[in-house]
Amino acid sequence: MSHSGAAIFEKVSGIIAINEDVSPAELTWRSTDGDKVHTVVLSTIDKLQATPASSEKMMLRLIGKVDESKKRKDNEGNEVVPKPQRHMFSFNNRTVMDNIKMTLQQIISRYKDADIYEEKRRREESAQHTETPMSSSSVTAGTPTPHLDTPQLNNGAPLINTAKLDDSLSKEKLLTNLKLQQSLLKGNKVLMKVFQETVINAGLPPSEFWSTRIPLLRAFALSTSQKVGPYNVLSTIKPVASSENKVNVNLSREKILNIFENYPIVKKAYTDNVPKNFKEPEFWARFFSSKLFRKLRGEKIMQNDRGDVIIDRYLTLDQEFDRKDDDMLLHPVKKIIDLDGNIQDDPVVRGNRPDFTMQPGVDINGNSDGTVDILKGMNRLSEKMIMALKNEYSRTNLQNKSNITNDEEDEDNDERNELKIDDLNESYKTNYAIIHLKRNAHEKTTDNDAKSSADSIKNADLKVSNQQMLQQLSLVMDNLINKLDLNQVVPNNEVSNKINKRVITAIKINAKQAKHNNVNSALGSFVDNTSQANELEVKSTLPIDLLESCRMLHTTCCEFLKHFYIHFQSGEQKQASTVKKLYNHLKDCIEKLNELFQDVLNGDGESMSNTCTAYLKPVLNSITLATHKYDEYFNEYNNNSN
């Protein structure tokens, strides 16, 4: 669209032109002979009127704003508002007038919205309201947005540093990450109750509590640190036209930051013009109506499309940015897989230049319609977004194999072998050597002898009596409970590590199969994907409050028992004080269990007490066994020292 054209002002012919290079923009009319010049500052215009399309006359009227400070009083003492200044232009061409009118509408609308925003800010400052950052704003052909000098997202700080993921997920960092632990406790009510009973009420150190839940912390940290990666932000922004030739755009602060990150040319245009040439809302209004916006979005730019004079200057600069990106993304490709390079180097296959009808995006005159440039721009943006993720989630450590141990390298090779596509490889065929056996005459048997031996085996008494079965079971249980010592099963650490590795490999394979086949790993059966929260509990004769007390006491006892065996079986002398504290906690657990049994017996009767005792008897026996082991080793140590 044109920004200039022939117009008549005060019955004098001339040329009217809109100058957007200055701030604020100006409309200048100059007579044909150059003697008369009339300039209108568009920021002072309040209304724009035009004759309808059905009228033979073609005129534009610009009505200026009324200055409230210049009110005056008449002879009767009443305040009289001064008349606004009017500018009338006549045209001889309907197309020229429509183009000028549309340009003036957009410019005047931007200034009016900026005035509304300034008035709103003045009211807020007068009312002494602190300005809070907005989660999203509406850019309406110049609607202001919060200033972006110090951007702050409302999502909050991440719980871990994803750029250094290996370091953030280490045991030391997880044990000292209090925010991560607090977030996990807030989201898991059951774990929160266990934490209150064991750490807050019973005095278990928090480091001990979390030391057995490192995998849980690590999984929670990974699940909460997931974030949206880079994407084509401009493709999600859709300007919507409204009344008064305004364009409404919903633009959040996060999208603005993503635009600056993915499109450096937009950030450069922003820093060059805000607040030097115009305010931030006017910048976004100009940007969304510019050709640069349509180009970055992946749309074709037609010759008749109207853009923005200032923002569209960065189109040529954007080409320089594209060339720099191409050089940065350029990487060598071997000729054995560079098919495009092979075709270009083959003169026989390539032949003469294809006809213009076979060239993509080129007309008969050899002019490009921009399709290839759009595709190249989208590919360039995709590569940049992928390159932006190379430092996220410790991807840079994948190529650094200097610190990888043999076991980790073997696991890495196993995973790579699983990912290989071996469908086209030749399958290995086993070749067997045929061996012919010759029997002697005295070793040959007849068919009748074979039948008789089979009948004798079939008729044999293979039944096992109940007494024999009970004897065998008691023998196995006696060996497992009294004679088997798990500490002496694998005395060599090397053998233990190999066995652990085989077990972990088997678990991985079974887990993949179970996930694929929807198999419950605990029951070994096919299950539905229904949530466990919807499952009904097993019926119990105990009241709900008593049952919940038994559960919490059982969980607390198991927690202390687990930590006791971890330190007790370590064999380290420096753990003696910790084992002593845990031993005292186990003694307290025994007292709490006995108190609960006695309270239930006195308050609810013998039958209820028997049920409660049956529930908690296994954990009581386990704690008693642990305390007996500690007393035994403690007495043995004292006797040896004496």
From Swiss-Prot:
Metal-binding listed as a keyword: no
GO terms (BP aspect): DNA repair; nucleotide-excision repair; transcription by RNA polymerase I; transcription by RNA polymerase II; transcription initiation at RNA polymerase II promoter
Phosphothreonine, modified sites: 150
Domain named BSD: residues: 165-221, 243-295
GO cellular component annotations of the record: cytosol; nucleotide-excision repair factor 3 complex; nucleus; transcription factor TFIIH core complex; transcription factor TFIIH holo complex
Keywords of this entry: DNA damage, DNA repair, Nucleus, Phosphoprotein, Repeat, Transcription, Transcription regulation
The keyword Membrane is assigned to this record: no
Compositionally biased residues, Polar residues: 129-143
Similarity section: Belongs to the TFB1 family.
Protein name: General transcription and DNA repair factor IIH subunit TFB1
Gene designation: TFB1
